[in-house]
Amino acid sequence: MAAASAMAEASSETTSEEGQSIQEPKEANSTKAQKQKRRGCRGSRRRHANRRGDSFGDSFTPYFPRVLKQVHQGLSLSQEAVSVMDSMIHDILDRIATEAGQLAHYTKRVTITSRDIQMAVRLLLPGKMGKLAEAQGTNAALRTSLCAIWQQRK
């Protein structure tokens, strides 16, 4: 019995030594990986810090005065009205994205296409409003793609 316990101790010593030798490189590798991750985060922050419109974040507030000026010159919006409109736009876009995602899921696809977005808009907005929104969105997409093609030709 003493021999069996001595063998058990010897085998536990070798496994603990092996475990220590294995753990040391993992710790060294993990610290290197953590440092690289930290460096990557800092670099990406610097790159995106100079992006235009970054001070507004995910807000549409800078666009409301521009659109209002095109539609009704001389009018202005209160801060409360801007806040309400901003939350409304966020809500509508969230609903469209959710509905388009569900449509893509129903057809067993992982990519949301422009057709999914068109159908989501038609489902969410009633009657003429849906048709008008779809037409405006299609025209905006065409203008954007035509501008991109025009820039490539230059």
UniProtKB/Swiss-Prot annotation:
Gene3D superfamilies: Histone, subunit A. In contrast to other H2B histones, it does not contain the conserved residue in C-terminus that is the target of monoubiquitination. Residues 1-18 have a biased composition (Low complexity). The lineage of its organism: Eukaryota, Metazoa, Chordata, Craniata, Vertebrata. The nucleosome is a histone octamer containing two molecules each of H2A, H2B, H3 and H4 assembled in one H3-H4 heterotetramer and two H2A-H2B heterodimers. The octamer wraps approximately 147 bp of DNA. SUPFAM superfamilies: Histone-fold. Belongs to the histone H2B family. CDD domains: HFD_H2B. Residues 1-61 are annotated as: Disordered. GO terms for cellular component: nucleosome; nucleus. Residues 34-50 have a biased composition (Basic residues). GO terms for molecular function: DNA binding; protein heterodimerization activity; structural constituent of chromatin. It comes from Homo sapiens (Human). This is Histone H2B type F-M.
